[in-house]
Amino acid sequence: MAGGSATTWGYPVALLLLVATLGLGRWLQPDPGLPGLRHSYDCGIKGMQLLVFPRPGQTLRFKVVDEFGNRFDVNNCSICYHWVTSRPQEPAVFSADYRGCHVLEKDGRFHLRVFMEAVLPNGRVDVAQDATLICPKPDPSRTLDSQLAPPAMFSVSTPQTLSFLPTSGHTSQGSGHAFPSPLDPGHSSVHPTPALPSPGPGPTLATLAQPHWGTLEHWDVNKRDYIGTHLSQEQCQVASGHLPCIVRRTSKEACQQAGCCYDNTREVPCYYGNTATVQCFRDGYFVLVVSQEMALTHRITLANIHLAYAPTSCSPTQHTEAFVVFYFPLTHCGTTMQVAGDQLIYENWLVSGIHIQKGPQGSITRDSTFQLHVRCVFNASDFLPIQASIFPPPSPAPMTQPGPLRLELRIAKDETFSSYYGEDDYPIVRLLREPVHVEVRLLQRTDPNLVLLLHQCWGAPSANPFQQPQWPILSDGCPFKGDSYRTQMVALDGATPFQSHYQRFTVATFALLDSGSQRALRGLVYLFCSTSACHTSGLETCSTACSTGTTRQRRSSGHRNDTARPQDIVSSPGPVGFEDSYGQEPTLGPTDSNGNSSLRPLLWAVLLLPAVALVLGFGVFVGLSQTWAQKLWESNRQ
């Protein structure tokens, strides 16, 4: 039976290949004297894709040809809308948008001429030829589709060809379906590609177990269900690992309609057979199932079957010893979609690579390769919108121009920041370590996208922001890490309008020390901040990230060397004075970070105590000596 089928279909296929070789396949004619490259292309909604199958050891290069015959190298270019994807042992894919460079529109069709080169490892060009991509494709009744044009290497060897028996595949209106007519490239859901020559003798045409295509039940129950071609008894003899078929109803009719096997005596009555099964679902999913039996028949490895254009994330959803299953959305995994009249056509490719075994003096393979072109066709008129999305045009870009920024630094009376000191209240007197609540704000601005940024804040002994010594309060917008009393940033409450126009922090009152004598400077401390305004747009968030690490150090006067860079500096209306806990300005001597100055009175007491004891002991000794001397003198007189 299989031999008869192969003989029956051998003559038409051979005739078709001969006609293609003689000249009808005008797009895929190789250069004289050079073997051709196997390739095919597809047309999508927004662009076209060229699929080229190199031989082992070949590297593909693409060039586009303009209307004057000039060739231009192809690289991944977002300006020209050209993209190339190439991986070892897999087809190379060249994609071009209809808006791309050198794509010409003639008579409502898009034309792109592509020059392909297969380069050997030594840099020599092994194969070179042109291909013209035309989208939408011309009428297949007048022009042979490139997917069936045979490469020149057909005449050199006897490759194993994967061919499919024709089946009746026309469904009723409104169903997702596939048309299994391999000799009609315009409607075929499977376009077999010749495999690599396999070792040993074999027939020129090897008949693949017939693939079946199923459809899901209609939404309209009054319409007649399409009854697909049933699998043969041999195809339903699955030895082990029966895989349940995806059907809505478990009836025999629904199972066979889906292209699956049915046996009510089994635990799994509806299961996939020993073939390739394609299912198209109205909820927007592809199901592709390939059996191990089919893989063995055509000398391919089941584990090497994958989606041609898919990323690595589109791996099989289920892989057993007997089957491999791909389940993915129609719009994912490299699926192309095009609109033909009132029909939506989704297409994808299943391909198989080869397993290479490397030896000490060479490499071999025992695998053939094949590709399975799957197609789902839906009637667009049957679909109703389930969601409408409105994308308003982007807001016009803000007009920017240079100008002054009005800023203000003021000191609040308490931590609530509800009232502030006026100019007549300065200088403000604070005890050492007492908190000072500081606010910097942007004035006369109502743009909510403006963000006030604090870069550096510091204290100085005069109204000159650059006078030394200085003490840093904020560094790069974050509390200065060298301060043992870390400055605290204060969040704004929700009632403050334009919160991004404000920055608040609390600093502990301090006294600047003279860098030479390390004694407290008698005077006032003025507060300064360098600021800028940032406009949030796109990826610019205008935020400052501060680390949470702490380092306790003694306050000492710092030195700023930022004066070379222009800055917007804002200062407090007046200075902050300080006094000790007794109401007097302290005159401190040198101290260390452990507060040893507070231990000095105790140290003096400890040192003076032995001296006092020594003086008292000496006095007692002198007194006793005089007493004993007088008593001795009186006793001698008597």
From Swiss-Prot:
GO terms for cellular component: collagen-containing extracellular matrix; egg coat; extracellular region; plasma membrane. Expressed in oocytes (at protein level). Glycans are attached at N76, N379, N561, N596. Proteolytically cleaved before the transmembrane segment to yield the secreted ectodomain incorporated in the zona pellucida. O-glycosylated. Residues 26-601 are extracellular. It is a single-pass type I membrane protein. Keywords: Cell membrane, Cleavage on pair of basic residues, Disulfide bond, Extracellular matrix, Fertilization, Glycoprotein, Membrane, Secreted, Signal, Transmembrane, Transmembrane helix. It is found in: Cell membrane. It holds the Pfam family Zona_pellucida. Component of the zona pellucida, an extracellular matrix surrounding oocytes which mediates sperm binding, induction of the acrosome reaction and prevents post-fertilization polyspermy. The zona pellucida is composed of 3 to 4 glycoproteins, ZP1, ZP2, ZP3, and ZP4. ZP1 ensures the structural integrity of the zona pellucida. The ZP domain is involved in the polymerization of the ZP proteins to form the zona pellucida. It is linked to Oocyte/zygote/embryo maturation arrest 1: An autosomal recessive infertility disorder caused by defective oocyte maturation that results in abnormal eggs lacking a zona pellucida. Affected females have normal menstrual cycles and sex hormone levels, no obstruction in the fallopian tubes or abnormalities of the uterus or adnexa. This is Zona pellucida sperm-binding protein 1. The lineage of its organism: Eukaryota, Metazoa, Chordata, Craniata, Vertebrata.
